């Protein structure tokens, strides 16, 4: 949910270069946090994301999304549309493990 504050995450980042999707850099920590979407309370004030009170699991998932959203925001200036739907076969090196 929080990724929407940077760009619509699915079309812009799901298959972006070697940096998002399974095995990507900004998305790596996010991928390790969980493998499904969930709903949780959060707010956006002055460009800062704040996770609200919820169950322990909701708060942890929100924090995973917050960190990923901030990572993507820091990378916006280097976003290149040519890397959308980039083939995995062009990525070099082993993927990290969680």
Swiss-Prot record:
Segments traversing the membrane: none
GO BP annotation list: arachidonate secretion; lipid catabolic process; negative regulation of T cell proliferation; phospholipid metabolic process
Thermal activity profile: Optimum temperature is 25-37 degrees Celsius.
pH-dependence of activity, as noted: Optimum pH is 8.0.
Enzyme class: hydrolase
Activity regulation behaviour: Inhibited by divalent cations different from calcium ions (cadmium, magnesium, manganese, zinc), since they act as competitive antagonists of this cofactor. Crotapotin F3 from C.durissus cascavella rattlesnake venom and antihemorrhagic factor DA2-II from D.albiventris opossum sera inhibit its enzymatic activity.
Subcellular location(s) per record: Secreted
PROSITE patterns: PA2_ASP, PA2_HIS
Tissue specificity annotation: Expressed by the venom gland.
Cystine pairs: 18-91, 20-27, 26-71, 32-98, 33-64, 51-62
Cofactors required: Ca(2+)
Binding site for Ca(2+): 19, 21, 23, 31
Entry's EC annotation: 3.1.1.4
One GO MF term: calcium ion binding
Record keywords: Calcium, Disulfide bond, Hydrolase, Lipid degradation, Lipid metabolism, Metal-binding, Myotoxin, Neurotoxin, Presynaptic neurotoxin, Secreted, Toxin
SUPFAM superfamilies named among the record's database cross-references: Phospholipase A2, PLA2 (SSF48619)
Catalytic activity: a 1,2-diacyl-sn-glycero-3-phosphocholine + H2O = a 1-acyl-sn-glycero-3-phosphocholine + a fatty acid + H(+)
Active site (UniProt): 30, 65
GO (cellular component) term, any one: extracellular region
KW ATP-binding (keyword) present: no
Cofactor note: Binds 1 Ca(2+) ion.
Task of the protein: Snake venom phospholipase A2 (PLA2) that induces myonecrosis, when intramuscularly injected into mice. Does not show systemic myotoxic effect (after intravenous injection). Does not show cytotoxic activities in myotubes and myoblasts. Induces marked paw edema after subplantar injections. Also induces an increase in vascular permeability and in the levels of TNF-alpha, IL-6, and IL-1 cytokines.
Family indicated by similarity: Belongs to the phospholipase A2 family. Group II subfamily. D49 sub-subfamily.
Name used for this protein in its record: Basic phospholipase A2 Bbil-TX
């Amino acid at each position: 949910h929080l990724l929407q504050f940077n760009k619509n995450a699915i079309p812009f980042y799901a298959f972006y270069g070697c940096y998002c999707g399974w095995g990507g850099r900004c998305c790596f920590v996010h991928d390790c946090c969980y493998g499904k979407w969930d709903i949780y309370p959060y707010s956006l004030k002055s460009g800062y994301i704040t996770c609200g009170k919820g169950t322990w699991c909701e708060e942890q998932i929100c924090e995973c999304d917050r960190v990923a959203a901030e990572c993507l925001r820091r990378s916006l200036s280097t976003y290149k549309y040519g890397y959308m739907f980039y083939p995995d076969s062009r990525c070099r090196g082993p993927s990290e493990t969680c």
